[in-house]
Amino acid sequence: MSKKVFIKTFGCQMNEYDSDKMADVLGAAQGYESTDDPEQADLILFNTCSVREKAQEKVFSDLGRYKHLKERGVLIGVGGCVASQEGEEIIKRAPYVDVVFGPQTLHRLPELLNARAAKHKPQVDISFPEIEKFDHLPPARVEGSSAFVSIMEGCSKYCSYCVVPYTRGEEVSRPFEDVLIEVAGLADQGVKEVTLLGQNVNAYLGKMGDTAEIADFALLLEYVSEIPGIERIRYTTSHPNEFTPRLIEAYARLPKLVSHLHLPVQHGSDKILMAMKRGYTAMEYKSTIRKLRAIRPEMAMSSDFIVGFPGETEEDFQKMMKLIHDVRFDNSFSFIFSPRPGTPAANLHDDTPHEVKLRRLQELQAVINNNIKDISDERVGTVQRLLVEGLSKRDGSELMGRTECNRVVNFPGNERLIGQMIDVKITEARTFTLRGEVVVRH
């Protein structure tokens, strides 16, 4: 009987990708099969996020909930950014944890588990062996028509509030050919849509073979678009400072590049952007969006926003609201500022009451939600090209797909359509989803 692993993932799409790789590594090296039921697991792994304090504390709360499973010999491991940041402290705080590993050492999981069994004590490896992990990962195994592909690791921007450079290391790009080989392998398995991943994905600079030449992100997109079977290309997360003219021009040449972009601006006040060390102004950000929409008028934009950064006045907040109005974002990930230990922003004086921050967050989210509704209403009556992903989560008798602009559409249809690209006429707009009907071509 095969051993089973339960992996709980916190945070970003990079972590989702890493969790899939953990399952692949353990399956190839030790025969583990994935399970969605922790009660059936022989190994429980937490792939953690430390971007916000609440996410970090939730990890320790959840660890306590699974502690009782140790009575039947279950192994528990903590990976991801909290592991990288806390290291041995996790063992001190939760001594029943067996292995602690960082984002760059997940490929060493089998070795760590073997060492735990041999030495009868917890094992910790939170080193930064740069790109080594990709050389030790088994070929990707996928189910479905879309897949993530990590093209680089880490970030070298050192924004004043962010722990990523400390938990995932500096930017390191995968070799150009390695990325193309992985994408081609996914296409051979039936994948039609790839999402290229990185903490700062558009800073990609990959080595080309044995030459001294370096491929930038725009060139990588061009080559990925030429791989047979790949019909859509997405990427996340990008940085405004790395949005080069070559990358903007790629939207004119590469129809497989979707008209949806997550480009975190974080704030709309130049004073706050400077304190965040973002390296651009609100006007420069809006200029990038104008250039993109001159090429793709239908470009859907989403962003991250931090409300209540130290020193934020009501005037600063209103500048952020003006930027939201000007850009017309149709989705966002917005949070109240959470000071992270070890970052410069954690030492900044913060005299804004929490209730003021909460009011501002609610006001921002209300505007974004109104944008979502208005843009969804505009889609009614249009025909949208969907990649059918599977059964609808709302109604298991229906199907769901995703538009190029990243909107979920639920519709009645035959399960044989799963994995296919089809046209659907939008018949109704709901709060965060659309409804439609398949367009029959005669």
UniProtKB/Swiss-Prot annotation:
Disulfide bonds: none annotated. Its EC number is 2.8.4.3. Residues 141-374 form the Radical SAM core domain. Transmembrane segments: none annotated. Binds 2 [4Fe-4S] clusters. One cluster is coordinated with 3 cysteines and an exchangeable S-adenosyl-L-methionine. Its main location: cytoplasm. Residues 377-440 form the TRAM domain. Keywords: 4Fe-4S, Cytoplasm, Iron, Iron-sulfur, Metal-binding, S-adenosyl-L-methionine, Transferase, tRNA processing. Residues 3-118 form the MTTase N-terminal domain. GO terms for cellular component: cytosol. Its cofactor is [4Fe-4S] cluster. NCBIfam families: miaB-methiolase (TIGR01574), MiaB/RimO family radical SAM methylthiotransferase (TIGR00089). Monomer. Catalyzes the methylthiolation of N6-(dimethylallyl)adenosine (i(6)A), leading to the formation of 2-methylthio-N6-(dimethylallyl)adenosine (ms(2)i(6)A) at position 37 in tRNAs that read codons beginning with uridine. This is tRNA-2-methylthio-N(6)-dimethylallyladenosine synthase. It comes from Delftia acidovorans (strain DSM 14801 / SPH-1). The gene is miaB.
